[in-house]
């Protein structure tokens, strides 16, 4: 479970609020880095405990959303076994989220939940009003869906989307189904996906959540800080131009 540099106790959460206020930020979600596909029951239950800790943190911060993952493939487990583990884990934490009045936003992430049919199956089988989707616009493209398929997926997921990660990239064969990872991640205005169209579509379909930037453009970890800030400011201006 990724906790950054602050603890999830009351003092740590108080510090989060202070830091957010000092920068004029609003905490829109707590991010759980869980993986329900585990080699043992003890490890699985540890993941459940970690997500519940994030739900408590969101509740105490007055934040409506916890971003969750499903899980990743594991050697020795079939895809079906992995999906069943994800469904079981999400059922356990969704019931707790319902009690706390927190929404879980399952991200399309990695090699399982980026399959949109599996993602929707998980939502259907968990069958909880507390479980929705965190729409990561770049991850479906990374997974190998063509540009037209990605646009159709966004339309399908809009009614069950509770949070977003705006991400973009370019692909040499953008109109074809590709292998996983055949994408170069770019600043938001420079990718193949028309994110302004996505943002407008979400609003038209009644989405009331935040438009969150998760720009993982190549070089973001090595460029000078001022250059990264410049690119992120351009991302913000780009998304604001949707309205």
Residue ranges and their predicted role:
Residues 20, 58, 104, 136, ...:
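Conserved, mostly hydrophobic/aromatic
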